Amino acid sequence: MIPGEVVCAEGVIELNEGSPRTELEVVNTGDRPVQVGSHVHFPQSNHALQFDRSAAHGLRLDIPAGTAVRFEPGIAQTISLVPLRGTREVHGLSLTPPGKLDAS
């Protein structure tokens, strides 16, 4: 074993296995590229991104942890979203009010 080495199981590892996926078209209406990280509650992403924010409620990008998607100005892009998991609470960013995504 090498310090920091990650040993994965044999075979294919499916990202977000079993999660329902939602596809949305996104257009960056701004004049600069926008990057959105893997665990951002997608409706709270940069307001220059034009997409159906209500359809994206409770969802994040379907990409590996620690990565991001870059949206270039004026280019339409279809993305895949999956539900946020765990406690489904979002603090900070622009959720008004911050906290639970689902009604209790």
From Swiss-Prot:
EC number: 3.5.1.5
Catalytic activity reported: urea + 2 H2O + H(+) = hydrogencarbonate + 2 NH4(+)
UniProt keyword list: Cytoplasm, Hydrolase
GO cellular component: urease complex
The protein's annotated pathway: Nitrogen metabolism; urea degradation; CO(2) and NH(3) from urea (urease route): step 1/1
Pfam families xref list: Urease_beta
Compartment list: Cytoplasm
Coiled-coil regions, chain positions: none
GO MF term set: urease activity
Enzyme class: hydrolase
Main location (coarse class): cytoplasm
Any one of the GO BP annotations: urea catabolic process
Family note: Belongs to the urease beta subunit family.
Oligomeric form and interacting partners: Heterotrimer of UreA (gamma), UreB (beta) and UreC (alpha) subunits. Three heterotrimers associate to form the active enzyme.
Name by which UniProt lists this protein: Urease subunit beta
Organism, scientific name: Rhodococcus jostii (strain RHA1)
Gene that this sequence comes from: ureB
